[in-house]
């Protein structure tokens, strides 16, 4: 086994580095949970100028944690510096929706963030860059960032559906009294929005079909909306948005992308036209990770019930794309 001294250091950029999600995310990265426990990491923290003090405090705490794999921390408000040589990037920082703000305005305002970041990635990142967009509206933010990075394959940009995927597993595990690791072949199709479609059609637990174990009415009337609206539920109960679970899911996504997995996961990737979903949008699909790339699980039979929900997501994502057409 290689020692850390003989393995090249991976540079990881995190935007919105002073925020709550990053406060959970950065410790996991520094602990080797993305690239493995033998690979040193260098963290590059990007923040807006008025939040650099907060990022400095985060960096101080990271250093105080004395992670054996953590080689260096850069704190900057300059996107070109932040993405210089980056092997992985978590785009966490985004503009939240203001009270009474239309979704089109939210998309446009975030385009002003993710477009320039995409260009900085295009101009400065390493050839093997992997970009995970966490900041919402994540699917269309990923589209905007990718469009601004014409020299980077679109497949190197993803939007996070793993939180929705993990929420779906959690709801099933609670319902059936089983461990989360026992579930396989769950997928969340579409958009990271209330329209998303958490799908248990192919899911199994301990070799049994989940659809044989739960009532269809519970699935449609409770499970699907509960997963789709879990974020709002947490805000109502906690008074704050779900940050630690988002960070944990981001780690899951990037780890599986880098290290590979044959287990099904939900990842928002550029549509290839699979399952009748139009190209030109970033959409949650059933995937496995092989050789550092997500591959769509092909050949699944789609019922009319599924088709309607998948199509609703595709239409919503196409509408979002049209709203930011001038940024693409």
From Swiss-Prot:
One of its GO terms (molecular function) is L-malate dehydrogenase (NAD+) activity. Pfam families: Ldh_1_C (PF02866), Ldh_1_N (PF00056). One of its GO terms (biological process) is malate metabolic process. Gene3D superfamilies: Lactate dehydrogenase/glycoside hydrolase, family 4, C-terminal, NAD(P)-binding Rossmann-like Domain. Substrate binds at residues 97, 103, 136, 167. Belongs to the LDH/MDH superfamily. MDH type 2 family. HAMAP family: Malate_dehydrog_2. This is Malate dehydrogenase.
């Amino acid at each position: 086994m290689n020692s850390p001294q003989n393995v090249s250091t991976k540079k990881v950029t995190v935007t919105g580095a002073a925020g709550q999600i990053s406060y959970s995310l950065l410790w996991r990265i520094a602990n080797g949970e993305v690239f493995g426990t033998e690979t040193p990491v260098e963290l590059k923290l990007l923040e807006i100028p008025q939040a650099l003090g907060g990022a400095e405090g985060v960096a101080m705490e990271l250093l105080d944690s004395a992670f054996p794999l953590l080689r260096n921390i850069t704190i900057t408000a300059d996107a070109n510096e932040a993405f210089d040589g980056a092997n992985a990037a978590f785009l966490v920082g985004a503009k939240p929706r203001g009270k009474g703000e239309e979704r089109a305005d939210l998309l446009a305002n975030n385009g002003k963030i993710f477009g320039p970041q995409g260009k900085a990635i295009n101009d400065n990142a390493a050839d093997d860059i992997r970009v995970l967009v966490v900041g919402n509206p994540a699917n269309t933010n990923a589209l905007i960032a990718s469009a601004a990075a014409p020299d980077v394959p679109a497949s190197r940009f993803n939007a996070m559906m793993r939180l929705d995927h993990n929420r779906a597993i959690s709801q099933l595990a609670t319902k059936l009294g089983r461990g989360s690791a026992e579930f396989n072949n769950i997928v969340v199709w579409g958009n990271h929005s209330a329209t998303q479609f958490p799908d248990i059609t192919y899911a199994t637990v301990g070799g049994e079909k989940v659809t044989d174990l739960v009532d269809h009415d519970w699935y449609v009337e409770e499970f699907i909306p509960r997963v789709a609206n879990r974020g709002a539920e947490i805000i109502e109960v906690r008074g704050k948005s779900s940050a630690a679970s988002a960070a944990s899911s981001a780690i899951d996504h990037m780890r599986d992308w880098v290290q590979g997995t044959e287990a099904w996961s939900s990842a928002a990737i550029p549509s290839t036209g699979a399952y009748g979903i139009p190209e030109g949008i970033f959409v949650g699909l059933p995937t496995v990770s092989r050789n550092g790339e997500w591959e769509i699980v092909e050949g699944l039979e789609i019922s009319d019930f599924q088709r309607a929900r998948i199509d609703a997501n595709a239409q919503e994502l196409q509408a979002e794309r049209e709203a930011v057409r001038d940024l693409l």
